């Protein structure tokens, strides 16, 4: 699977959003109720939503975040053959509430990415860009 990174707002069409979420200085990942693997909070952009609105909605639905800020990190295109576009956001969570319980079974804090990821060909690429490029550019 290919995964390419672009500056924010480069792509003309977005299908997905991904949040790289920090809480108490650690990476917050979620586990879907039907899987044993860990993933970032994100998903499809719904009709009429901007990528930022979708990122905020997915963050709340999949982590229980109550107070947070999000900022665009990059665009990405991933897939085999036909690439599908998405936007990555940095989410700084100040307060977590109860999990909505719709899709995710639990969240957990990590110092780094675990080996058992739901999307092992995409998440490390996005996290690496976030960690090595995006954070380095922040004041």
Where are the language model's segments positioned?
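Unchanged
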Residues: 45-69, 75-129
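Conserved hydrophobic "DFG−1" position in protein kinase catalytic cores
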Residues: 19-21, 29, 91, 109
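Glycosyltransferase-associated regions of secretory-pathway enzymes
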Residues: 129-137
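Classical N-terminal secretory signal peptides
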Residues: 1, 138-139
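Acidic, metal-coordinating catalytic segment for phosphate/diphosphate chemistry
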Residues: 1-18
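Short connector loops at helix/strand junctions that flank enzyme active sites
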Residues: 14-16, 22, 33-35, 40, ...
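Conserved Nudix-box catalytic region and its N-terminal flanking loop in Nudix hydrolases
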Residues: 22-61
